[in-house]
């Protein structure tokens, strides 16, 4: 089974997360996409609502979208959510699966700063979402990692891990910070949030009086 992995704090989950994942699923013909909320994200000090609420919102999205599932492996962990550790655990649990780890171009350009980042290439394929027309600098140091591993979406993979796909996805001008700020001001950003997420946030009175300084 070909499974896309989309991790994040999802604080809250919004169309800026969902729509690129749908495009990746279609372009790479994935069987499923797993939404994986972080419990303790390594690059952020905290989240704004509980892990339970963020899991519940991800579950609402998966309930509405066929082939979207929630993976709670990081949510159950009481230590920072390092991707290499998570993918190693997933490969152990699901050795028959072929994992595609989805990230934005900004994350990919900083991947060499990640914990044991080189292990990722033995555990999964990397999918990098970029804006149409955006080009990676030919002199960027990441090119030494990218060039021998890059594949087009239409090309077959070399085994179950180790390839990198750079995919054009439609630009989504949405950030969790902006969504939280609007919610704190009493506005419901209906263009950014599925109706079920809007209802959940209102019913549970989330994002009221919290700081909204972190990004996605």
From Swiss-Prot:
Function comment: Catalyzes the reversible adenylation of nicotinate mononucleotide (NaMN) to nicotinic acid adenine dinucleotide (NaAD).
PANTHER family: NICOTINATE-NUCLEOTIDE ADENYLYLTRANSFERASE-RELATED (PTHR39321), PHOSPHOPANTETHEINE ADENYLYLTRANSFERASE (PTHR39321:SF3)
Reaction catalysis annotation: nicotinate beta-D-ribonucleotide + ATP + H(+) = deamido-NAD(+) + diphosphate
One GO-annotated biological process of the protein: NAD biosynthetic process
Entry-linked Gene3D superfamilies: HUPs
GO molecular function, one term: nicotinate-nucleotide adenylyltransferase activity
Classification via HAMAP family: NaMN_adenylyltr (MF_00244)
Pathway stated in the Swiss-Prot or TrEMBL entry: Cofactor biosynthesis; NAD(+) biosynthesis; deamido-NAD(+) from nicotinate D-ribonucleotide: step 1/1
Keywords associated with the record: ATP-binding, NAD, Nucleotide-binding, Nucleotidyltransferase, Pyridine nucleotide biosynthesis, Transferase
Source organism (scientific name): Shewanella halifaxensis (strain HAW-EB4)
Protein name: Probable nicotinate-nucleotide adenylyltransferase
InterPro entries, per the entry: Cyt_trans-like, NadD/NMNAT, Rossmann-like_a/b/a_fold
Keyword match Nucleotidyltransferase: yes
Keyword field contains Transport: no
One Pfam family in the UniProt entry: CTP_transf_like
Protein family according to the UniProt entry: Belongs to the NadD family.
Enzyme Commission code(s) on record: 2.7.7.18
Top-rank taxon, per record: Bacteria
